[in-house]
């Protein structure tokens, strides 16, 4: 028999708050976390704005020496996982370590280390790179460091699917628990790629917004949208088998009841114009959850503020939800957080969970004039109080990746 899977812990480090409570408070205020780049000298870059984590202080969880050896993407991941672990009130005796998994991923991994060590290799010779280079660069060491820290000896399986990576990782952790292989799992993602190489790589693809006004930079579904704003951060959820959570007296935030994943098999960066893969992904999640389209109250959209994504994602929502697409609330929180790439799905899943708890939909803050083909209720400007019993989070990624999760109050 399939097991029930619930969320018992949340952790986040984001451009609008370095813990879950602060992030949510700022989300409800419509705080814009986008600003001028400070993590590197962007004076010669075509792109000068990003959504950075501010006043990063890892000292609550990591001593200065340890943090100094780790790539920023790993530090962010450890911080979010630590908050989630504490929030869930887990302890070494609370779970069988071999039934405790880690599904914490990244879209790109340790790009800060890749960039800095490549500069060292060019300037001083390849044999002068740091001995920590490889372990800081590879994606599985985000989750690997978390599993070592908390003695989670079950599978460490980061699903790497670009900007849907953490959504897929949460979905696969869900399946492992639902099918009886695990009792508890860290699930989510971390990203920190705001450096000269990361910004340039996306900029030359014309994927990034290149203006210099943070208030008008990330404008999902807006007529004037022109590209995404790179963000950084981490989000981790504790997924737990329901009976296991009840037995230890854990508080339960919400239940995860559906997961869908597809590939467009169409193009390396562009979504399929027909929205077939996007819509099928949501349909699979609904089937998995045993819900009708009319059951969904809120969709946290991928909503990147790129011309293609927002138009095609809107089409996909209409194809699945029909007339109900105009009755439910949709929003993109990327106007506040920027696009956190492989971490975005985890942070947006946390937003869905908090929406269920608080019965409120977070806003799309920067959008003022909707594009004609984007005509849904995108919750513009301010949060909306409404009944939210089922929330769907969808994320898309380069390579035609599509992933959707459904959470139940």
Predicted regions and their residues:
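Condensing-enzyme catalytic core mediating Claisen C-C bond formation in acyl metabolism
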Residues: 4-8, 35, 213-289, 298
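Acyl-CoA/ACP chain-elongation machinery
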Residues: 181-226, 259-273, 303-310, 327-377
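Conserved beta-ketoacyl condensing-enzyme motif
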Residues: 7, 23-24, 28-161, 190-199, ...
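Glycine-/small-residue-rich "gating" segment that lines the acyl/pantetheine channel
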Residues: 123-130, 171, 175, 191-247, ...
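Phosphate/pyrophosphate-binding loops at sites that engage ATP/ADP/AMP, CoA/4′-phosphopantetheine
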Residues: 84-96, 245-250, 282-298, 320-324
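Active-site-proximal alpha-helical scaffold in enzymes
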Residues: 77-90, 139-143, 147-191, 229-250, ...
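Short pre-catalytic strand/loop immediately N-terminal to key active-site residues, enriched for Gly-Thr
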Residues: 129-134, 154-161, 222-226, 328-339, ...
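A glycine- and small-aliphatic-rich helix-loop capping segment at beta-alpha/alpha-beta transitions
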Residues: 21-28, 112-126, 176-179, 199-212, ...
């Amino acid at each position: 028999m399939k097991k029930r899977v619930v969320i018992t812990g949340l952790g986040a480090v984001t451009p609008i708050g370095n813990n879950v409570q602060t992030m949510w408070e700022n989300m409800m205020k419509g705080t814009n976390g986008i600003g001028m780049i400070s993590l590197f000298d962007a004076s010669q870059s075509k792109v000068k704005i990003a959504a950075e984590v501010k006043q990063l202080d890892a000292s609550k969880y990591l001593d200065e020496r340890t943090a100094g050896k780790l790539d920023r993407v790993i530090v962010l991941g450890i911080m979010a996982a630590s908050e989630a672990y504490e929030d869930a009130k887990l302890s070494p005796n609370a779970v069988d370590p071999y039934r405790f998994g880690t599904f914490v991923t990244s879209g790109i991994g340790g790009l800060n280390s890749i960039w800095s060590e490549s500069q060292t290799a060019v300037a001083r010779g390849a044999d002068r790179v740091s001995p920590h280079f490889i372990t800081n660069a590879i994606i599985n060491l985000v989750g690997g460091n978390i599993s070592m820290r908390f003695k989670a000896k079950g599978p460490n399986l980061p699903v790497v699917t670009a900007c849907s990576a953490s959504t897929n990782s949460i979905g696969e952790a869900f399946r492992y628990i639902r099918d009886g292989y695990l009792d508890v799992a860290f699930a989510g993602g971390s990203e920190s790629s705001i450096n000269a190489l990361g910004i340039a790589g996306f900029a030359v693809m014309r994927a990034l917004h290149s203006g210099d006004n943070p208030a008008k930079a990330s404008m999902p579904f807006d007529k004037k949208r022109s590209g995404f704003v790179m963000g950084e951060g981490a989000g981790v959820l504790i997924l737990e088998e329901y009976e296991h959570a009840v037995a230890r007296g854990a508080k339960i935030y919400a239940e995860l009841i559906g997961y869908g994943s597809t590939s467009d098999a169409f193009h390396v960066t562009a979504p399929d114009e027909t929205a077939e893969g996007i819509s099928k992904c949501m349909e699979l999640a609904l089937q998995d959850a045993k819900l009708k389209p009319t059951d969904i109250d809120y969709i946290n959209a991928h909503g990147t503020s790129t011309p293609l994504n927002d138009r095609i994602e809107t089409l996909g929502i209409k194809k699945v939800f029909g007339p109900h697409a105009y009755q439910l609330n949709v929003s993109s929180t990327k106007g506040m957080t920027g696009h956190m790439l492989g971490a975005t799905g985890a942070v947006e899943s946390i937003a869905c969970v908090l929406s269920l708890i608080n019965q409120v939909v977070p806003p799309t803050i920067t959008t003022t004039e909707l594009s004609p083909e984007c005509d849904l209720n995108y919750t513009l400007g301010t949060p909306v109080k409404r009944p939210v019993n089922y929330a769907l989070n969808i994320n898309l990624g380069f390579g035609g990746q599509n992933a959707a999760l459904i959470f139940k109050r």
